[in-house]
């Protein structure tokens, strides 16, 4: 399993924390189907940028969860490594 940061450029524009939590909970509800584990997310309601940290078998699996749960896909996905 690898760590991924995925970026949605405008998905959160104008959304509040409660709405983002609901969006995230839909990802969590189906993540096991794809072998994905979402760990954290950050968002900026002004710019709409959202960043999701996940552990997953592939970038495609991360996007499959987002697509199935919320009808959106990440604009960018990066493999990341945790520093010490």
Mark where each language-model region is:
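An amphipathic, aromatic/His-enriched active-site/gating alpha helix that lines ligand/cofactor pockets
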Residues: 55-84
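Short S/T/G/P-rich N-terminal loop/turn motif that feeds into the first structured element of a domain
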Residues: 1-33, 37-39, 43-48, 65, ...
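Short beta-strand-to-loop capping motifs
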Residues: 8-10, 53-57
């Amino acid at each position: 399993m690898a760590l991924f940061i995925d970026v949605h450029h405008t998905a959160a524009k104008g959304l509040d924390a409660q709405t983002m939590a609901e969006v995230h909970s839909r990802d969590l509800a189906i993540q096991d189907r794809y072998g994905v584990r979402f760990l954290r997310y950050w968002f900026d309601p002004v710019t709409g940028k959202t960043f999701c940290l996940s552990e997953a078998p592939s970038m495609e699996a991360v996007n499959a969860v987002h697509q199935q749960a919320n009808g959106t896909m990440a604009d960018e996905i990066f493999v990341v490594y945790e520093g010490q």
